[in-house]
């Protein structure tokens, strides 16, 4: 099948690799190179780099909402468009430009976690099951019909990186299965109940509320690493917790109290045992290294 691919980050790479192997990728659309590092050198997106290595034509428009881009897409000899974490809204004229429309990999059990941050919200909400869906896109926000779906259980303390990689690889495999059977698949309309929205994360959301349960705080730590990071303030400095574990233990302490010299913190229910931290503008340290340089005394009440 002849394919136009639209995507940008590492999450989209496994799918493009599969498409290059099994189909004919006619063109790739991705975000423009961005300045990175201290030298602010322009860096291609992971998708741009992969397409470049395979000598696939790459386009980096600043928007899809203009006639020039729509005409360009219409001229590309393709049967279908695949869109994965591209970063731009796809207008109706492009959604309907090819025979089989536009397909999208969405890493959640739709209609749960529609929106920009389904992986993060899955972990933050403490979900124990999830899915990867192949969806035919329409003009709504992740409201299109489901062509194929695979459910799976989540490990209790899965990290964002682990979930990201699992869904990216599973989605790539599911996409190839979908394309192989696309003429025989009966699309399934998403149910109207159970709709939730995985809104984009904000830095403010990362602030830890010690009145929440240790389990919920641990979910936030895993779901917000690396960005924005779950953090607390100490001596007017922001400190991110990169890794921790929760203990289902009863206690009589005020929420936020440091109850040991190993940085175990009393929460609304349970205790959070911190394992890895990062003070702003400093490198990440395990708890032993951190406490050698920053002494957070027992009985301190964190805010």
Swiss-Prot record:
EC main group: transferase
Keywords: Protein biosynthesis, Transferase
Listed GO CC annotations: cytosol
CDD domains for this protein: FMT_core_Met-tRNA-FMT_N, Met_tRNA_FMT_C
Keyword Cell membrane: no
Listed EC numbers: 2.1.2.9
Catalytic activity reported: L-methionyl-tRNA(fMet) + (6R)-10-formyltetrahydrofolate = N-formyl-L-methionyl-tRNA(fMet) + (6S)-5,6,7,8-tetrahydrofolate + H(+)
Domain of life, per lineage: Bacteria
GO molecular function, one term: methionyl-tRNA formyltransferase activity
Residues binding (6S)-5,6,7,8-tetrahydrofolate, per UniProt: 108-111
Sequence similarity: Belongs to the Fmt family.
NCBIfam families in the record: fmt
Function statement: Attaches a formyl group to the free amino group of methionyl-tRNA(fMet). The formyl group appears to play a dual role in the initiator identity of N-formylmethionyl-tRNA by promoting its recognition by IF2 and preventing the misappropriation of this tRNA by the elongation apparatus.
Protein name per UniProt: Methionyl-tRNA formyltransferase
Organism, as annotated: Rickettsia africae (strain ESF-5)
Native organism taxonomy: Bacteria, Pseudomonadati, Pseudomonadota, Alphaproteobacteria, Rickettsiales
């Amino acid at each position: 099948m002849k394919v136009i691919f639209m995507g940008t980050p590492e999450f989209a790479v496994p799918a493009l690799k599969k498409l290059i192997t099994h189909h004919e990728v006619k063109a790739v659309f991705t975000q423009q190179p961005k300045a990175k590092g201290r030298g602010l050198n322009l860096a291609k997106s992971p998708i741009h780099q992969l397409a470049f290595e395979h000598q696939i034509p790459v386009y980096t428009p600043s928007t899809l909402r203009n006639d020039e881009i729509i005409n360009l897409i219409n001229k590309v000899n393709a049967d279908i468009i695949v869109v994965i974490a591209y970063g731009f809204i796809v207008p109706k004229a492009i959604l309907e430009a090819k025979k089989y429309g536009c397909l999208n990999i969405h890493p959640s059990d739709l209609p749960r976690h529609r929106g920009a941050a389904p992986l993060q919200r899955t972990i933050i909400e403490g979900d124990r099951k999830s899915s990867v869906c192949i969806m035919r896109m329409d003009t709504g926000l992740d409201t299109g019909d489901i062509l194929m779906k695979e459910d799976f259980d989540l490990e209790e303390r899965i990290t964002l990186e682990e979930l990201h990689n699992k869904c990216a690889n599973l989605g790539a495999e599911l996409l190839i299965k979908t394309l192989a059977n696309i003429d025989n698949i009966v699309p399934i309309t998403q149910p109207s109940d159970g709709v939730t929205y995985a809104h984009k994360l904000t830095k403010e959301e990362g602030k830890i509320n010690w009145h929440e349960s240790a389990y919920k705080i641990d979910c936030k730590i895993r779901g917000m690493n690396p960005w924005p990071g779950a953090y607390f303030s100490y001596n007017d400095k922001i400190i991110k917790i990169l890794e921790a574990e929760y203990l289902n233990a009863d206690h009589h302490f005020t929420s936020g109290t440091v109850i040991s010299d190993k940085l175990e913190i009393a929460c609304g229910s349970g205790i959070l045992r911190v394992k890895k931290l990062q003070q702003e503008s400093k490198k990440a340290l395990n708890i032993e290294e951190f406490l050698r340089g920053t002494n957070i005394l027992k009985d301190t009440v964190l805010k």
